[in-house]
Amino acid sequence: MAVGKEIRTQISSINNTRKITRAMEKVAASKTRKAQDRMAASRPYAERIRQVVGHLANANPEYKHRYLTEREAKRVGYIVISSDRGLCGGLNVNVFKKAIRDMKQFADTGVEIDICAIGSKAVSFFRNYGGNVTAAHTGLGDAPKADDLVGSVKVMLDAFDEGRIDRLYVVSNEFVNTMTQNPTVEQLLPLKAEENTELKHHWDYIYEPEAVEILDELLVRYIESQVYQSVVENIACEQAARMLAMKNATDNAGDIIDELQLVYNKARQAAITQEISEIVSGAAAV
């Protein structure tokens, strides 16, 4: 039964694939939990440094730092964060669509765009798409450190300091839960003023060195922390999306195996019926 042999080969092949996707699902689930822990651990630092920056800025209202001053947007920069690997559903495609939609609003008004791509998928996409990629970073792995991103972020901060870009945005995926990841665009520079009564409160701190010098340094650290937080959150999204994609692949493989098994059983039944008919016909002829 040649047909039956082919079907058994297909079933065996798909079953082997199902074993791989099931293993990848379990690995992704483990990495998702670790990524969530890193995300939760880094969030308090990002929030606290934002508060300190707010206190310093309100304590020195006469000092207008360039990162706090709005200016006409003639050229804008985007830090687009993606994964280094695939097999994570539409995670990267969704963030690219979000970035392009936001960029189009500026491009339609003649504003030029610079891109810092983080993650090999973003680098390859925007280089093929034709974007002006001024900085790129790949190979961050599953547990990146803030220092790994300093170089790429510095390229965009230097461009802002020198007036080559007038605004800076970060595009990444927001982790809602293991089933939901939303692509978002956040403005990094200039910093938007927040209506926060706690930040407006006068804090009687003693600064060493001067508050202005601390503010200069903290604003850079703040931008770096925000980008790092976005990268860590995007990694959690990547692992959650991969876990879901591998689960769907495993389930689909099971459905295909069931269908092929049914086809095999029908083919085997037909072959047996034919053999019986031939035996009966032969006996009748005798």
UniProtKB/Swiss-Prot annotation:
GO terms for biological process: proton motive force-driven plasma membrane ATP synthesis. GO terms for molecular function: ATP binding; proton-transporting ATP synthase activity, rotational mechanism. The keyword Membrane applies. It is a peripheral membrane protein. It holds the Pfam family ATP-synt. Keywords: ATP synthesis, Cell inner membrane, Cell membrane, CF(1), Hydrogen ion transport, Ion transport, Membrane, Transport. One of its GO terms (cellular component) is proton-transporting ATP synthase complex. F-type ATPases have 2 components, CF(1) - the catalytic core - and CF(0) - the membrane proton channel. CF(1) has five subunits: alpha(3), beta(3), gamma(1), delta(1), epsilon(1). CF(0) has three main subunits: a, b and c. This is ATP synthase gamma chain. It comes from Marinomonas sp. (strain MWYL1).
